[in-house]
Amino acid sequence: MASPELASHHSDPSDGEGAPFLPGVDDESPESLNSDIPFQKHSNHGLIIKLFVIYLAIGMGGPMIQSPLTRIVESIACRNYWNAHDPSQLPGPEQISEGMCKIPEVQREVTTIIGYREFFNAFLTSTFALPYGLLADRYGRKLAIRLASVGFVFNSVLSFAPIWLPNIFPLRTMWFGAVGWVLGGGPVLLFALFWSMIADATADSERDTVILRFGIATVSAGFLANVTSSFVMKFDSRVPLMTGCGLLFAGLLVANLLPETLRKKSPETTISADTSVSLTSLFFRIKKTIWSYRFICYNYPVAVILPAFFVTQLAGGSAFLVQYISIRFHRTIADATLLVALQHAFTIPVLFFILPQISERLRAYISRLQSDLLLARISVMLLALGLFGIGLSSSINTLIPSLLLHAGGAGFVLIARGLITGLARREETARLYTLIEATQSIGEVTASLYITNSLNWGLGRGGLWIGLPWLIVSFLLALIALVLGILRLPPRSENASSGSTH
Protein backbone atom coordinates (compact mmCIF):
# COMPACT_ATOMS: atom_id res chain seq x y z
CA MET A 1 0.00 0.00 0.00
CA ALA A 2 1.34 3.34 -0.94
CA SER A 3 1.99 5.91 1.74
CA PRO A 4 1.49 9.29 0.05
CA GLU A 5 2.29 12.62 1.61
CA LEU A 6 -1.00 14.46 1.80
CA ALA A 7 -1.01 18.09 0.80
CA SER A 8 -3.05 19.03 3.83
CA HIS A 9 -0.60 17.64 6.37
CA HIS A 10 3.02 18.47 7.06
CA SER A 11 5.20 17.00 9.79
CA ASP A 12 8.50 18.21 11.09
CA PRO A 13 10.33 15.60 13.15
CA SER A 14 12.16 18.26 15.06
CA ASP A 15 9.07 19.86 16.55
CA GLY A 16 8.23 16.87 18.71
CA GLU A 17 5.04 15.76 17.03
CA GLY A 18 6.74 12.67 15.71
CA ALA A 19 6.96 11.14 19.15
CA PRO A 20 4.80 8.03 18.76
CA PHE A 21 2.68 6.13 21.22
CA LEU A 22 4.33 2.93 19.97
CA PRO A 23 7.07 3.93 17.56
CA GLY A 24 7.88 2.02 14.43
CA VAL A 25 11.33 1.68 12.99
CA ASP A 26 10.68 4.61 10.72
CA ASP A 27 9.09 6.84 13.31
CA GLU A 28 12.24 8.66 14.36
CA SER A 29 14.47 10.81 12.25
CA PRO A 30 17.83 9.36 11.17
CA GLU A 31 19.69 12.14 12.89
CA SER A 32 18.43 11.08 16.30
CA LEU A 33 19.35 7.44 15.92
CA ASN A 34 22.53 5.56 16.64
CA SER A 35 21.97 2.36 14.72
CA ASP A 36 23.44 0.74 11.65
CA ILE A 37 20.10 -0.90 10.77
CA PRO A 38 18.81 0.62 7.52
CA PHE A 39 15.24 1.74 7.00
CA GLN A 40 12.95 -1.09 5.94
CA LYS A 41 13.07 -1.55 2.15
CA HIS A 42 12.63 -5.33 2.09
CA SER A 43 10.40 -7.48 4.26
CA ASN A 44 11.93 -9.12 7.35
CA HIS A 45 10.56 -12.60 6.73
CA GLY A 46 11.97 -14.08 9.95
CA LEU A 47 10.07 -11.60 12.11
CA ILE A 48 6.94 -11.98 9.98
CA ILE A 49 6.99 -15.77 10.46
CA LYS A 50 7.26 -15.40 14.24
CA LEU A 51 4.37 -12.93 14.28
CA PHE A 52 2.40 -15.31 12.05
CA VAL A 53 2.88 -18.14 14.57
CA ILE A 54 1.73 -15.83 17.37
CA TYR A 55 -1.42 -14.85 15.49
CA LEU A 56 -2.13 -18.48 14.64
CA ALA A 57 -1.86 -19.56 18.29
CA ILE A 58 -3.90 -16.64 19.61
CA GLY A 59 -6.37 -16.97 16.74
CA MET A 60 -7.07 -20.57 17.77
CA GLY A 61 -6.83 -20.15 21.52
CA GLY A 62 -9.24 -17.23 21.88
CA PRO A 63 -12.20 -18.71 19.96
CA MET A 64 -11.63 -22.14 21.51
CA ILE A 65 -12.20 -20.66 24.98
CA GLN A 66 -15.38 -18.66 24.30
CA SER A 67 -18.06 -21.31 23.79
CA PRO A 68 -16.88 -23.71 26.54
CA LEU A 69 -16.69 -20.78 28.95
CA THR A 70 -20.25 -19.77 28.09
CA ARG A 71 -21.49 -23.34 28.52
CA ILE A 72 -19.75 -23.80 31.89
CA VAL A 73 -21.07 -20.46 33.16
CA GLU A 74 -24.54 -21.43 31.92
CA SER A 75 -24.34 -24.80 33.67
CA ILE A 76 -23.29 -23.26 37.00
CA ALA A 77 -25.87 -20.45 36.77
CA CYS A 78 -28.55 -22.99 35.85
CA ARG A 79 -27.73 -25.24 38.80
CA ASN A 80 -27.75 -22.23 41.13
CA TYR A 81 -31.17 -21.20 39.82
CA TRP A 82 -32.80 -24.61 40.27
CA ASN A 83 -31.16 -25.05 43.68
CA ALA A 84 -32.87 -21.85 44.76
CA HIS A 85 -36.27 -22.48 43.13
CA ASP A 86 -36.86 -26.23 42.69
CA PRO A 87 -34.02 -28.57 43.74
CA SER A 88 -36.08 -31.62 42.74
CA GLN A 89 -35.47 -30.74 39.07
CA LEU A 90 -31.72 -31.25 39.40
CA PRO A 91 -30.32 -34.53 37.99
CA GLY A 92 -27.73 -34.96 40.74
CA PRO A 93 -24.00 -34.34 40.67
CA GLU A 94 -23.71 -34.93 36.91
CA GLN A 95 -23.84 -32.06 34.40
CA ILE A 96 -27.24 -30.47 34.05
CA SER A 97 -28.90 -30.70 30.61
CA GLU A 98 -28.90 -27.60 28.43
CA GLY A 99 -32.64 -27.82 27.90
CA MET A 100 -33.22 -26.82 31.52
CA CYS A 101 -30.97 -23.78 31.09
CA LYS A 102 -32.70 -21.99 28.19
CA ILE A 103 -35.21 -20.19 30.39
CA PRO A 104 -34.99 -16.35 30.41
CA GLU A 105 -34.01 -16.15 34.10
CA VAL A 106 -30.88 -18.24 33.55
CA GLN A 107 -29.98 -16.67 30.22
CA ARG A 108 -30.20 -13.16 31.63
CA GLU A 109 -27.72 -14.15 34.34
CA VAL A 110 -25.39 -15.73 31.76
CA THR A 111 -25.61 -12.64 29.54
CA THR A 112 -24.87 -10.39 32.52
CA ILE A 113 -21.85 -12.41 33.65
CA ILE A 114 -20.31 -12.81 30.19
CA GLY A 115 -21.22 -9.29 29.08
CA TYR A 116 -19.82 -7.45 32.08
CA ARG A 117 -16.74 -9.65 32.05
CA GLU A 118 -16.12 -8.44 28.49
CA PHE A 119 -16.81 -4.87 29.59
CA PHE A 120 -14.32 -4.85 32.47
CA ASN A 121 -11.69 -6.58 30.33
CA ALA A 122 -12.08 -4.10 27.48
CA PHE A 123 -12.27 -1.06 29.78
CA LEU A 124 -9.12 -1.80 31.78
CA THR A 125 -7.04 -2.92 28.83
CA SER A 126 -7.99 0.27 26.97
CA THR A 127 -7.23 2.43 30.01
CA PHE A 128 -3.78 1.00 30.67
CA ALA A 129 -2.68 0.70 27.04
CA LEU A 130 -1.56 4.35 26.97
CA PRO A 131 0.83 4.35 29.97
CA TYR A 132 2.32 1.00 28.97
CA GLY A 133 2.62 2.29 25.43
CA LEU A 134 4.73 5.15 26.79
CA LEU A 135 6.80 2.58 28.67
CA ALA A 136 7.31 0.61 25.45
CA ASP A 137 8.31 3.85 23.74
CA ARG A 138 11.05 4.52 26.28
CA TYR A 139 12.29 1.12 27.46
CA GLY A 140 11.47 -1.11 24.50
CA ARG A 141 8.82 -3.53 23.35
CA LYS A 142 10.26 -6.67 24.92
CA LEU A 143 9.68 -5.31 28.43
CA ALA A 144 6.09 -4.35 27.54
CA ILE A 145 5.41 -7.83 26.12
CA ARG A 146 6.83 -9.52 29.23
CA LEU A 147 4.70 -7.43 31.57
CA ALA A 148 1.62 -8.12 29.45
CA SER A 149 2.36 -11.86 29.62
CA VAL A 150 2.37 -11.74 33.42
CA GLY A 151 -0.92 -9.83 33.24
CA PHE A 152 -2.40 -12.64 31.15
CA VAL A 153 -1.46 -15.15 33.84
CA PHE A 154 -3.18 -13.11 36.56
CA ASN A 155 -6.24 -12.64 34.34
CA SER A 156 -6.55 -16.37 33.70
CA VAL A 157 -6.20 -17.36 37.36
CA LEU A 158 -8.72 -14.81 38.62
CA SER A 159 -11.19 -15.47 35.77
CA PHE A 160 -11.24 -19.25 36.01
CA ALA A 161 -11.25 -19.64 39.80
CA PRO A 162 -15.09 -19.41 39.98
CA ILE A 163 -15.32 -22.12 37.30
CA TRP A 164 -13.07 -24.61 39.03
CA LEU A 165 -14.29 -23.77 42.55
CA PRO A 166 -17.95 -22.69 42.12
CA ASN A 167 -18.80 -23.61 45.72
CA ILE A 168 -16.22 -21.14 47.01
CA PHE A 169 -16.29 -18.28 44.49
CA PRO A 170 -19.56 -16.85 43.11
CA LEU A 171 -19.68 -16.66 39.32
CA ARG A 172 -19.54 -12.87 39.29
CA THR A 173 -16.13 -12.88 40.96
CA MET A 174 -14.69 -13.76 37.55
CA TRP A 175 -15.08 -10.05 36.78
CA PHE A 176 -12.01 -9.46 38.98
CA GLY A 177 -9.93 -11.20 36.31
CA ALA A 178 -9.83 -7.89 34.47
CA VAL A 179 -7.49 -6.60 37.21
CA GLY A 180 -4.77 -8.61 35.47
CA TRP A 181 -4.73 -6.04 32.66
CA VAL A 182 -3.49 -3.42 35.12
CA LEU A 183 -0.14 -5.16 34.69
CA GLY A 184 1.02 -4.87 31.10
CA GLY A 185 -1.94 -3.24 29.38
CA GLY A 186 -3.43 -6.46 28.00
CA PRO A 187 -4.48 -7.31 24.43
CA VAL A 188 -4.82 -3.72 23.16
CA LEU A 189 -1.15 -2.96 23.75
CA LEU A 190 -0.01 -6.38 22.51
CA PHE A 191 -1.87 -6.12 19.22
CA ALA A 192 -0.73 -2.53 18.74
CA LEU A 193 2.83 -3.77 19.17
CA PHE A 194 2.28 -6.70 16.81
CA TRP A 195 0.71 -4.60 14.06
CA SER A 196 3.43 -2.01 14.41
CA MET A 197 6.05 -4.76 14.08
CA ILE A 198 4.28 -6.09 10.99
CA ALA A 199 4.40 -2.61 9.46
CA ASP A 200 8.08 -2.28 10.40
CA ALA A 201 8.99 -5.67 8.90
CA THR A 202 7.00 -5.33 5.67
CA ALA A 203 7.93 -3.47 2.52
CA ASP A 204 5.29 -1.15 1.04
CA SER A 205 4.82 -3.37 -2.01
CA GLU A 206 4.06 -6.42 0.14
CA ARG A 207 1.98 -4.87 2.94
CA ASP A 208 -1.44 -5.63 1.42
CA THR A 209 -0.54 -9.28 0.87
CA VAL A 210 0.91 -9.70 4.36
CA ILE A 211 -2.10 -8.08 6.07
CA LEU A 212 -4.46 -10.30 4.05
CA ARG A 213 -2.51 -13.44 4.95
CA PHE A 214 -2.63 -12.57 8.63
CA GLY A 215 -6.38 -12.11 8.31
CA ILE A 216 -6.74 -15.48 6.57
CA ALA A 217 -4.63 -17.17 9.25
CA THR A 218 -6.76 -15.69 12.03
CA VAL A 219 -10.05 -16.69 10.37
CA SER A 220 -8.80 -20.18 9.50
CA ALA A 221 -7.58 -20.68 13.05
CA GLY A 222 -10.92 -19.48 14.38
CA PHE A 223 -12.75 -21.96 12.14
CA LEU A 224 -10.61 -24.89 13.29
CA ALA A 225 -10.97 -23.80 16.91
CA ASN A 226 -14.76 -23.57 16.73
CA VAL A 227 -15.14 -26.94 14.97
CA THR A 228 -12.83 -28.63 17.48
CA SER A 229 -14.51 -26.92 20.40
CA SER A 230 -18.00 -27.84 19.14
CA PHE A 231 -17.06 -31.52 18.83
CA VAL A 232 -15.19 -31.86 22.14
CA MET A 233 -17.84 -29.90 24.09
CA LYS A 234 -20.29 -32.75 23.53
CA PHE A 235 -18.12 -34.79 25.92
CA ASP A 236 -16.52 -32.25 28.28
CA SER A 237 -16.50 -28.46 28.04
CA ARG A 238 -13.39 -28.12 30.18
CA VAL A 239 -11.09 -29.84 27.67
CA PRO A 240 -11.37 -27.20 24.89
CA LEU A 241 -11.25 -24.49 27.56
CA MET A 242 -7.87 -25.65 28.82
CA THR A 243 -6.60 -26.35 25.30
CA GLY A 244 -7.45 -22.79 24.29
CA CYS A 245 -5.60 -21.44 27.32
CA GLY A 246 -2.58 -23.53 26.37
CA LEU A 247 -2.54 -22.11 22.85
CA LEU A 248 -2.80 -18.55 24.16
CA PHE A 249 0.15 -19.02 26.46
CA ALA A 250 2.12 -20.71 23.67
CA GLY A 251 1.56 -17.59 21.55
CA LEU A 252 2.72 -15.41 24.43
CA LEU A 253 5.82 -17.55 24.83
CA VAL A 254 6.75 -16.98 21.19
CA ALA A 255 5.99 -13.27 21.64
CA ASN A 256 8.57 -13.12 24.42
CA LEU A 257 11.15 -14.43 21.95
CA LEU A 258 10.60 -11.57 19.49
CA PRO A 259 13.59 -9.30 18.95
CA GLU A 260 13.64 -5.74 20.21
CA THR A 261 12.63 -3.44 17.33
CA LEU A 262 12.83 -0.09 19.13
CA ARG A 263 15.80 1.83 17.74
CA LYS A 264 18.41 3.03 20.20
CA LYS A 265 18.80 6.75 20.47
CA SER A 266 22.04 8.65 20.67
CA PRO A 267 23.81 8.90 24.05
CA GLU A 268 22.92 12.58 24.28
CA THR A 269 19.24 11.82 23.80
CA THR A 270 19.37 8.95 26.29
CA ILE A 271 21.08 11.05 28.97
CA SER A 272 18.57 13.84 28.45
CA ALA A 273 15.67 11.41 28.75
CA ASP A 274 17.06 9.80 31.89
CA THR A 275 17.51 13.12 33.68
CA SER A 276 14.03 14.40 32.82
CA VAL A 277 12.07 12.66 35.51
CA SER A 278 10.07 15.50 37.00
CA LEU A 279 6.29 15.57 36.98
CA THR A 280 6.42 18.61 34.71
CA SER A 281 8.50 16.82 32.09
CA LEU A 282 6.23 13.78 32.34
CA PHE A 283 3.19 16.00 31.78
CA PHE A 284 4.74 17.61 28.71
CA ARG A 285 5.79 14.20 27.40
CA ILE A 286 2.22 12.92 27.64
CA LYS A 287 0.94 16.17 26.11
CA LYS A 288 3.44 15.83 23.25
CA THR A 289 2.40 12.23 22.70
CA ILE A 290 -1.28 13.16 22.52
CA TRP A 291 -0.44 16.15 20.32
CA SER A 292 1.36 13.84 17.90
CA TYR A 293 -2.01 12.35 16.95
CA ARG A 294 -3.31 15.63 15.56
CA PHE A 295 -2.43 14.47 12.04
CA ILE A 296 -5.88 12.82 12.09
CA CYS A 297 -7.50 16.26 12.13
CA TYR A 298 -5.72 17.22 8.90
CA ASN A 299 -6.41 13.96 7.09
CA TYR A 300 -10.12 13.98 6.24
CA PRO A 301 -10.35 10.48 4.65
CA VAL A 302 -8.60 8.88 7.64
CA ALA A 303 -10.86 10.77 10.06
CA VAL A 304 -14.07 9.54 8.40
CA ILE A 305 -12.89 5.92 7.98
CA LEU A 306 -11.67 5.53 11.57
CA PRO A 307 -15.18 5.32 13.17
CA ALA A 308 -15.85 2.22 11.07
CA PHE A 309 -13.47 0.28 13.32
CA PHE A 310 -15.67 1.27 16.27
CA VAL A 311 -18.99 0.34 14.65
CA THR A 312 -17.83 -3.10 13.47
CA GLN A 313 -17.01 -3.99 17.08
CA LEU A 314 -20.58 -3.26 18.21
CA ALA A 315 -21.81 -6.52 16.70
CA GLY A 316 -19.96 -8.27 19.52
CA GLY A 317 -17.84 -11.39 19.32
CA SER A 318 -18.68 -15.00 18.62
CA ALA A 319 -19.63 -15.60 22.26
CA PHE A 320 -22.68 -13.31 22.00
CA LEU A 321 -23.66 -14.73 18.60
CA VAL A 322 -23.39 -18.31 19.86
CA GLN A 323 -25.57 -17.50 22.86
CA TYR A 324 -28.10 -15.70 20.65
CA ILE A 325 -28.38 -18.68 18.26
CA SER A 326 -28.65 -21.09 21.19
CA ILE A 327 -31.49 -19.09 22.79
CA ARG A 328 -33.39 -18.00 19.69
CA PHE A 329 -33.38 -21.32 17.84
CA HIS A 330 -33.29 -23.70 20.83
CA ARG A 331 -29.92 -25.24 19.95
CA THR A 332 -27.17 -26.48 22.20
CA ILE A 333 -24.16 -24.21 22.56
CA ALA A 334 -22.06 -26.86 20.78
CA ASP A 335 -24.43 -26.83 17.77
CA ALA A 336 -24.55 -23.03 17.76
CA THR A 337 -20.75 -22.99 17.81
CA LEU A 338 -20.71 -25.26 14.76
CA LEU A 339 -22.97 -22.84 12.86
CA VAL A 340 -20.60 -19.98 13.68
CA ALA A 341 -17.71 -22.21 12.54
CA LEU A 342 -19.44 -22.71 9.18
CA GLN A 343 -19.67 -18.94 8.88
CA HIS A 344 -15.93 -18.72 9.51
CA ALA A 345 -15.35 -21.43 6.92
CA PHE A 346 -17.06 -19.31 4.27
CA THR A 347 -14.89 -16.31 5.10
CA ILE A 348 -11.76 -18.27 4.10
CA PRO A 349 -12.52 -18.37 0.34
CA VAL A 350 -13.79 -14.80 0.59
CA LEU A 351 -10.46 -13.60 1.96
CA PHE A 352 -8.17 -16.00 0.13
CA PHE A 353 -9.73 -16.23 -3.35
CA ILE A 354 -12.63 -13.87 -3.99
CA LEU A 355 -11.26 -10.58 -2.63
CA PRO A 356 -7.73 -10.99 -4.10
CA GLN A 357 -9.15 -11.87 -7.52
CA ILE A 358 -11.55 -8.94 -7.54
CA SER A 359 -8.83 -6.62 -6.26
CA GLU A 360 -6.37 -7.74 -8.93
CA ARG A 361 -8.88 -7.17 -11.72
CA LEU A 362 -9.90 -3.78 -10.35
CA ARG A 363 -6.30 -2.58 -10.16
CA ALA A 364 -5.96 -3.09 -13.89
CA TYR A 365 -8.33 -0.14 -14.30
CA ILE A 366 -8.13 1.95 -11.12
CA SER A 367 -5.54 2.80 -8.48
CA ARG A 368 -4.79 0.71 -5.41
CA LEU A 369 -6.59 3.05 -3.01
CA GLN A 370 -9.61 3.38 -5.29
CA SER A 371 -9.82 -0.41 -5.44
CA ASP A 372 -9.63 -0.67 -1.65
CA LEU A 373 -12.33 1.97 -1.25
CA LEU A 374 -14.68 0.19 -3.66
CA LEU A 375 -14.16 -3.17 -1.93
CA ALA A 376 -14.70 -1.52 1.47
CA ARG A 377 -18.04 -0.13 0.27
CA ILE A 378 -19.21 -3.54 -0.95
CA SER A 379 -17.98 -5.37 2.16
CA VAL A 380 -19.64 -3.07 4.67
CA MET A 381 -22.93 -3.35 2.77
CA LEU A 382 -22.72 -7.15 3.02
CA LEU A 383 -22.04 -6.84 6.76
CA ALA A 384 -25.09 -4.62 7.21
CA LEU A 385 -27.39 -6.92 5.21
CA GLY A 386 -26.06 -10.01 7.00
CA LEU A 387 -26.64 -8.59 10.48
CA PHE A 388 -30.09 -7.40 9.45
CA GLY A 389 -30.96 -10.95 8.42
CA ILE A 390 -29.45 -12.44 11.58
CA GLY A 391 -31.54 -10.13 13.75
CA LEU A 392 -34.77 -10.85 11.87
CA SER A 393 -34.36 -14.59 11.27
CA SER A 394 -37.05 -16.76 12.80
CA SER A 395 -35.67 -20.13 11.65
CA ILE A 396 -32.37 -21.81 10.81
CA ASN A 397 -33.35 -21.74 7.13
CA THR A 398 -33.17 -17.95 7.08
CA LEU A 399 -30.34 -17.67 9.61
CA ILE A 400 -27.78 -19.64 7.58
CA PRO A 401 -28.02 -17.45 4.43
CA SER A 402 -27.73 -14.38 6.66
CA LEU A 403 -24.60 -15.79 8.31
CA LEU A 404 -23.09 -16.44 4.87
CA LEU A 405 -24.01 -12.95 3.69
CA HIS A 406 -22.34 -11.49 6.78
CA ALA A 407 -19.29 -13.67 6.09
CA GLY A 408 -19.11 -12.14 2.61
CA GLY A 409 -18.20 -8.83 4.24
CA ALA A 410 -15.59 -10.35 6.54
CA GLY A 411 -12.77 -8.59 4.73
CA PHE A 412 -14.03 -5.12 5.56
CA VAL A 413 -11.82 -4.46 8.59
CA LEU A 414 -8.72 -5.73 6.78
CA ILE A 415 -9.54 -3.72 3.66
CA ALA A 416 -10.23 -0.62 5.76
CA ARG A 417 -6.92 -1.13 7.59
CA GLY A 418 -5.05 -1.31 4.29
CA LEU A 419 -6.95 1.69 2.92
CA ILE A 420 -6.33 3.88 5.95
CA THR A 421 -2.65 2.85 5.96
CA GLY A 422 -2.28 4.01 2.38
CA LEU A 423 -3.83 7.36 3.24
CA ALA A 424 -1.35 8.01 6.06
CA ARG A 425 2.33 8.85 5.89
CA ARG A 426 4.91 6.19 6.64
CA GLU A 427 6.05 7.84 9.89
CA GLU A 428 2.44 7.94 11.10
CA THR A 429 1.86 4.19 10.73
CA ALA A 430 2.67 3.12 14.30
CA ARG A 431 0.52 5.87 15.82
CA LEU A 432 -2.28 5.12 13.39
CA TYR A 433 -2.29 1.40 14.26
CA THR A 434 -2.35 2.25 17.96
CA LEU A 435 -5.30 4.55 17.33
CA ILE A 436 -7.09 1.78 15.41
CA GLU A 437 -6.54 -0.72 18.23
CA ALA A 438 -7.76 1.83 20.79
CA THR A 439 -10.84 2.60 18.66
CA GLN A 440 -11.65 -1.09 18.38
CA SER A 441 -11.16 -1.56 22.10
CA ILE A 442 -13.52 1.32 22.88
CA GLY A 443 -15.95 -0.39 20.54
CA GLU A 444 -15.56 -3.60 22.54
CA VAL A 445 -16.24 -1.72 25.79
CA THR A 446 -19.37 -0.19 24.31
CA ALA A 447 -20.46 -3.44 22.66
CA SER A 448 -20.28 -5.47 25.86
CA LEU A 449 -22.55 -3.02 27.70
CA TYR A 450 -24.80 -2.48 24.70
CA ILE A 451 -25.37 -6.15 23.85
CA THR A 452 -25.65 -7.22 27.49
CA ASN A 453 -28.41 -4.74 28.28
CA SER A 454 -30.25 -4.85 24.95
CA LEU A 455 -30.16 -8.66 24.84
CA ASN A 456 -31.47 -8.87 28.41
CA TRP A 457 -34.20 -6.40 27.44
CA GLY A 458 -35.07 -8.53 24.42
CA LEU A 459 -35.09 -11.74 26.47
CA GLY A 460 -37.76 -10.23 28.69
CA ARG A 461 -39.99 -9.66 25.68
CA GLY A 462 -39.11 -12.64 23.53
CA GLY A 463 -39.60 -13.18 19.80
CA LEU A 464 -37.96 -10.79 17.35
CA TRP A 465 -36.89 -8.48 20.18
CA ILE A 466 -34.07 -10.91 21.03
CA GLY A 467 -32.35 -9.94 17.78
CA LEU A 468 -32.55 -6.19 18.51
CA PRO A 469 -28.78 -5.72 19.16
CA TRP A 470 -27.87 -6.93 15.68
CA LEU A 471 -30.64 -4.95 13.97
CA ILE A 472 -29.36 -1.68 15.43
CA VAL A 473 -25.76 -2.43 14.42
CA SER A 474 -26.92 -3.24 10.88
CA PHE A 475 -28.41 0.27 10.70
CA LEU A 476 -25.14 1.84 11.90
CA LEU A 477 -23.18 -0.16 9.32
CA ALA A 478 -25.56 1.10 6.66
CA LEU A 479 -24.61 4.64 7.72
CA ILE A 480 -20.92 3.72 7.37
CA ALA A 481 -21.67 2.41 3.88
CA LEU A 482 -23.33 5.74 3.06
CA VAL A 483 -20.30 7.70 4.32
CA LEU A 484 -17.91 5.55 2.29
CA GLY A 485 -20.19 5.92 -0.71
CA ILE A 486 -19.82 9.70 -0.75
CA LEU A 487 -16.12 9.70 0.26
CA ARG A 488 -13.73 10.93 -2.41
CA LEU A 489 -10.01 10.27 -2.18
CA PRO A 490 -7.53 13.16 -2.37
CA PRO A 491 -6.18 13.38 -5.96
CA ARG A 492 -2.61 13.22 -4.73
CA SER A 493 -3.32 10.00 -2.83
CA GLU A 494 -4.77 8.42 -5.95
CA ASN A 495 -1.75 9.40 -8.04
CA ALA A 496 0.74 8.11 -5.46
CA SER A 497 -1.15 4.86 -5.09
CA SER A 498 -1.38 4.37 -8.84
CA GLY A 499 2.31 4.92 -9.17
CA SER A 500 3.15 2.26 -6.63
CA THR A 501 0.82 -0.31 -8.07
CA HIS A 502 2.37 -0.88 -11.43
Curated annotation (Swiss-Prot):
Glycan-carrying positions: 495
What residue intervals traverse the membrane? 45-65, 114-136, 150-170, 175-195, 214-234, 239-259, 302-322, 336-356, 380-400, 403-423, 464-484
Matches recorded under CDD domains? MFS
The entry's keywords: Cell membrane, Glycoprotein, Membrane, Transmembrane, Transmembrane helix, Transport
Task: Identify a single GO molecular function assigned to this protein.
Answer: transmembrane transporter activity
Q: Does the keyword Transmembrane apply?
A: yes
Q: How does it sit in the membrane?
A: Multi-pass membrane protein
User: What name does this protein carry?
Assistant: MFS-type transporeter aprT
Organism from which the protein derives: Aspergillus flavus (strain ATCC 200026 / FGSC A1120 / IAM 13836 / NRRL 3357 / JCM 12722 / SRRC 167)
